[in-house]
Amino acid sequence: MRNRIWIIMVLFSLLLSACEKWLDVKPEDEVDANVLFETGQGYRNALNGVYNNMAEVSMYGKEMTWGAVDVIAQLYSSFTQVTAWSKMMDYAYEDTDTKSIISSIWSDTYTAITNCNNLIEQVVGEDPDVFVLGEMERNLILGEAYALRAFLHFDMLRLFAPAPAVADNRGYIPYFEKHGSLAEPYLSVDSVVGRVERDLLRAKDLLATYDTVGDNSSALLTVYRLNGDPNPFVDIEDLFFFYRGYRMNYYAATATLARVYDYAGRGEEACKQALEVINATGVNSNGGARKQCFTFTEVVGITIVETPKLHDGVIFGLSSSTLIDDYKPYVPEGGGGNVTRLRVDKDAIYEKSVEDQRAHLVTTEGYSLKYQEHRGSDAVDDLIPMIRLSEMYFIVSDYLYRNGKTVEIAKDGEINVKDGIRMLNDVRFGRGITVHGQISNVDELEDAIIREARREFIGEGQLFFYYKKYNKKPVDKMVYYFPLPDNELIH
């Protein structure tokens, strides 16, 4: 592996505006790693480069969210022309076009992992005095790098291996932890989960030294986490510490760990991590009581189109300045000439509900507004949601229902006792639904959670993994994981 990486040369502005984010930067040069890591700014640039890797169209900027991964979840209506996506919808994974998409997902994800490893190896032994905030900033960068390495490996596991509940002891994917390594042994599903868990626990310990300390917790409230409002607790001249929702913050690592435990069938541990996120609070800059960090976006009727991503509940997201343009060709409103249209069956998904506010985010013809251009001041047009509060509720709901348990949820200074059904209904209520169907067994609960996932995660690449986790199929021919790219079969 060459000791050179693409990095982002960042020009920080001293004045914060609504469209300025630490992540809004462009690649300009290739710099030797020895030069890059001479300064604290170089470490920041290297970390930023990983996030930019992840936002590329071959990864979460398209294929691993609203592209291929939502296609194989059967989210979209049938395509009228033969394309790579129409072949993926039929699980024709041996086709040349689909192989190309799968290969790019694999190779670009492992490239991002390589960049994580380079950063980790460099920052571990670095003198804290190199960083503006010393040890605290060093821990922050290292914690994010560990968490991102775990996050990326976990998605490779979800895409290229069977679910833990049905997995055998075969090796499915490698887990790279050393920069420069060209090959690592292929590990079993359980072994990969163990390494992901270890990296996330490391990350939580490191990130806690910044995100949960004193007034820093205020940065995880929505107005600062995603909207970027001026924060009286943070130096306004240093944008590196703004927009924690666009970075792998402490609660993003916690939510990822909840996702991992849930996928692995470790319900009690998943519930514990998810509840930590649900109950998270931050310092209120107005001097009042602490506020919930993550909430369900409050909207009234059609005004929901001003907040199409319902971002108050987004725990972690990526920034893509080209997201709207990348999405335009696939919807009539974009005026693009692409023959592929990403249309969903609105009536089937929302069951003609007059209450579900998410239904306003899909046009009558079935096109999602989530990644189209918006005029609302809080539209966060560049945001690609990666982990949501609703997922944490689904995790807790599942565990409580299966085990006949209840938990205490703190909200607005009050403690409420919830069981599994109430946790699921809280998501529905948060989206405007007041009438809920009956659930009488685990199978019906799983079906109900899948229905909510279809409504909640349009364009976010998560629905497929609910089918996989519950071993259910929207179509009989669904295949639960990709074959390895051809160039990996030599291992």
Each language-model region and where it sits:
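Alpha-helical solenoid repeat scaffolds, predominantly canonical TPR units
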Residues: 115, 192, 199, 206, ...
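Conserved, well-structured interaction surfaces
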Residues: 44, 83-160, 182-190, 206-207, ...
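Membrane-proximal, proline-rich intrinsically disordered regions
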Residues: 19-71, 320, 421, 425, ...
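Alpha-helix C-terminal capping/termination sites
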Residues: 155, 162, 229, 263, ...
